[in-house]
Regions:
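Conserved, function-defining micro-sites of small-solute handling proteins
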Residues: 1-187
């Protein structure tokens, strides 16, 4: 419910609200800023140089919460050291099926997936690009590879370069708006 997610965050024992991310300008910061703006919360961003230092400070009580990837948080979640409040993806994570999405928590339309992409230089010959795409599709569909990826917290999927370009074109305006509103710069 809306109240529980907001209450979980706003009832932190820390007098000054802050949250950790795995770095300035990362999807971790963007997802946090997107949510806190929608929730009407003023939360100070504490950027870390990666997930590990942010998680260390979360576990040590230096920050009250963090926005991180499922794969980075999964070991601590499995050990019961931290609690997942919500996932930012459009659907529940197969790895955390009991954890609601932000939309299910009362924030419809809030969605931000973290994804990884294989990239190559501009001007890559079409034949090389086609071979790379085919190889990547085969690797991602290989059951053994998929099992290994799932075991470390990934939800593997494949998208062609065309689909990836469409995704980037769709997400870029949202990211620009969040960056402008939260004064996120490339410093």
């Amino acid at each position: 419910s809306t109240g529980s997610t907001r209450t979980d965050i706003s009832s932190s024992k820390r007098p000054t609200q802050s949250y950790g991310s795995f770095g300035t300008g990362t999807t971790s910061q963007f997802a946090g800023e997107m949510f806190f703006h929608a929730a009407g919360l003023k939360i100070r961003h504490v950027p870390y140089k990666g997930s590990a230092p942010a998680m260390t400070d979360l576990l040590g009580g230096q920050i009250p919460f963090t926005v991180d990837t499922v794969s980075a948080a999964l070991p601590q979640l499995k050990d019961g050291k931290i609690k997942a409040i919500a996932v930012t993806s459009g659907k529940r994570s197969a790895l955390l099926p009991k954890v609601p999405t932000l939309a299910e928590s009362g924030y419809p339309g809030l969605e931000m997936d973290t994804w990884l992409a294989m990239v190559a230089p501009r001007g890559l010959p079409p034949a090389v690009k086609a071979r790379l795409e085919l190889a990547l599709a085969q690797v991602v569909s290989d059951p053994e590879t998929r099992d290994k990826m799932v075991a470390v917290g990934f939800e593997p999927s494949y998208a062609s370069s065309k689909v990836l370009a469409e995704l980037i074109d769709k997400e870029l305006p949202l990211m620009r708006a969040i960056a402008q509103r939260a004064a996120i710069t490339a410093d």
